[in-house]
Amino acid sequence: MCGRFNLIDSPEIQWLCESLGIQLYSEQCKPDIAPGGSIAFIHCKGGERLVSEATWWLFLDQDPDSSNYLKPNYKYASFNSRSDKLSNKRAIAYTPYRESRCLIPASAFVEGLGDKKTYHKIELEESAITFGGLYKEHLNRDTGEIIYSASIITLPPL
């Protein structure tokens, strides 16, 4: 499981972006990204690789207090999508796995041990990583704007 991650503007991240033929802007880099936060993700649209911003939570609901705002659906913890459930037709990530895969760049990530207090931060030395991910497009009915949400594909817990 990935509980938090970092995306810092470094030579390694710049090299990764150049290798993928994309441009990552400094405002898309963040030192401590938590579930529900804004993340950069790489996806294809019309045969072109793009970097877009997404909420790190795959399933969003309309906020009843605001007609224009989508927020994480906390009923379903969907910031991560377990790899062993992607083939299950009843799984919430089943359709995005078949239709909208993406890459999520990172410089470091944090793993929890399940007790919510003990964490391990894995910092990549002179390297960068991309997580495999899933994304969804949501239409803001008032503005016509496309809003993205995404999750990281993870292994089942040990």
Q: What name fits each language-model region?
A:
Residues 1-158:
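Short linear sequence motif anchored by a di-proline
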